[in-house]
Amino acid sequence: MWAKAALAILLAVALAACGGSSGGRTSPSTGEAASASTSTLAAKRLQPARWTTFVHVSRPLDVAGPRRDGSIVLAAAGHLALLAPNGSARPFASAYRSPGGEEPYIDVAPPGCFGADVVYALRLRPPQGVVRVSADGRVRQLAILSAPGLIDGIAFDRTGAFGRRLLVTINAGRRTTVEAIDCRGHIQTITQHAPRVEGGLAVAPASFGRFGGDLIAPDEISGVIYAITPGGKSILIGASGLPHGQDIGVESAGFVPAGGRAEALLADRRTPGNRHPGDDVVLGIGRAALAAAGVRAGDLLLAGEGGTLTDAVRCGRAGCQIRRVAVGPRIAHGEGHIAFSVGR
């Protein structure tokens, strides 16, 4: 069965050429919220970037990495593949097959006890939780999650603020539970009262102002961006300024890494019947285009699900600044994280 699915993914792969602020608003009452001011960066001859086709692929859902060999892990059509910087793909972990669920997002472990390059994926069917997919393709359950609601976000803490654990969000109506999981599968609840969030979570680097080390999470319904602290407080960073609403609002997040050779990648999944039906491609923005748009290392990129309009958030001692930096195809349907590959 995997062979047929892998062949479908690889046959669908074809190389393609690569190319609001709010002030002092407070988050909904959770008993754990504060406020943060934002401002808008003045445009200084900056050129907005554009998401273009990096590679065609069947049913892409999420991208994560890079791994130590420079490849990006792609979740597509219920399986995993590895994307090389030139856009070529090869199957990975034939034993892994998503048991179902609309959005079983993934992340790749940094060096440490989780195992460098090991993939962790949300499992949305019983037993619900997180599965571990080793670098040699073996699959086992890491943790079973019992909090009520939809498991809808996953991100590694690479800063140490959360003890270098894996963070998972579970949404139940207007409230979100955040669980921290260690490499042995032990679970600690960070909060059960965070605001509603969903999608491509990211933990902020230390350079991200007062929010360094916090879990950054968007809410596609309202369009706002929250920071969730290791102590469980939810702080409003600001409004993204992107269109918001179900299947429209800000969905994907990723921090631009140091090094200056980053190419941003984002899954654009075909979703028939949606206002943004998608393209079944992985979209990309090259490093030169990011630089021309004023994006630099340490910035947070946030892309909307409908049309992949993209903001950059930059936080420092003086506060946070939010600015539109990229546009995408109007029909695009962004999903999962924004990952960064070695630029072509």
Predicted ranges, named:
Residues 1-7:
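Bacterial N-terminal signal peptides that target proteins for export
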